[in-house]
Design a protein with these regions (language model features):
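Patatin-like phospholipase
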Residues: 2-198
Length: 198
């Protein structure tokens, strides 16, 4: 947030110039290499798991990645995981077209449980009771025309997210997970530029 005003890495000018609302070169090259050097050696040496989720554009399903050896592959996965539909380009990981994992698995709690984790903490950006509007969303055939499964996933996204929220609230009520979330509705855009709001 502190760097948003100085570096201006979000906005329509990026979308118009590079077909990406985010300045990925700045975010994933300049920041980790020069501005805020990322300690890849410590990351690679850590025994902790770090799982990144993307949406496979060919299958319309979630892909989960762990990478602890190849720096450029880490960047590819992070770029894909950050590639928001409609405003960011498709990003390739291992020659497979990918977008943000939030399309199909916004809250990967089920995956954590399947991986054997029993003490989970879920961090949400919306207050309890929040639900997305689930009116029928039809993605026109010219949008992502090469990826019909992705279009299907995008049309189901809100319903899937709401179902995940229901599961989170139920498990929270049962004392099975800890949830960190705002107490009141948050009035910020998904890609917010106003530093005061953030």
């Amino acid at each position: 947030i502190d760097l948003l005003e100085k570096y201006n890495y979000i906005g329509l000018k990026h979308l118009l110039r590079k077909r990406n609302i985010l300045d990925f070169d700045l975010l994933f090259t300049e920041f980790p290499e020069h501005i805020l050097p990322y300690d890849y050696d410590t990351y690679f040496a850590s025994p902790e798991r770090f799982v990144m989720v993307t949406t496979n554009c060919m299958t319309g399903e979630a892909n989960y990645f762990e990478e602890k050896r190849d720096k450029s592959r880490v960047i590819d996965i992070v770029r894909a995981s950050s590639s928001l539909p409609f405003v960011c380009p498709v990003t390739y990981v291992d020659d497979v077209p990918m977008l943000d994992g939030g399309i199909v698995d916004s809250i990967p709690l089920q995956r954590a449980i399947a991986d054997g984790y029993t003490r989970n903490v879920v961090v949400l950006t919306r207050n309890r009771g929040y639900r997305k509007d689930t009116k029928d969303i039809r993605i026109p055939s010219f949008v992502y025309r090469k990826y019909p499964k992705l279009r299907e996933a995008l049309s189901r996204r809100c319903a899937v997210y709401n179902k995940q929220l229901e599961m989170v609230e139920q498990m929270e009520d049962e004392g099975k997970i800890i949830v960190i979330r705002p107490q009141k509705p948050v009035m910020v855009d998904r890609i917010e530029r106003d530093v005061q709001k953030l």
